């Protein structure tokens, strides 16, 4: 319930641009969000393993 309230508050426009911060589009997580994809590392890893992110592969060396 607390997270839902934070997500709703995050969606409202901010008075100052510097107060805006990135959140995951899927789960709403505020930390470790990749700008290029707009999702957090947890969702990124899950979606990459499922093959839902085109062009993303596991590194092998």
Curated annotation (Swiss-Prot):
Protein family (similarity comment): Belongs to the universal ribosomal protein uS14 family. Zinc-binding uS14 subfamily.
GO cellular component: cytoplasm; small ribosomal subunit
GO biological process: translation
UniProt entry tagged with the keyword Ion transport: no
InterPro entries linked: Ribosomal_uS14, Ribosomal_uS14_bact, Ribosomal_uS14_CS, Ribosomal_uS14_sf
Protein's UniProt name: Small ribosomal subunit protein uS14
HAMAP family found in the cross-reference section: Ribosomal_uS14_2_B
Presence of the UniProt keyword Phosphoprotein in the record: no
Residues that, per the record, bind Zn(2+): 24, 27, 40, 43
Cofactors, names only: Zn(2+)
Keywords annotated in UniProt: Metal-binding, Ribonucleoprotein, Ribosomal protein, RNA-binding, rRNA-binding, Zinc
Subunit and interaction comment: Part of the 30S ribosomal subunit. Contacts proteins S3 and S10.
Family annotation (PROSITE patterns): RIBOSOMAL_S14
Superkingdom per UniProt: Bacteria
GO molecular function, one term: zinc ion binding
Function noted in UniProt: Binds 16S rRNA, required for the assembly of 30S particles and may also be responsible for determining the conformation of the 16S rRNA at the A site.
Co-factor binding comment: Binds 1 zinc ion per subunit.
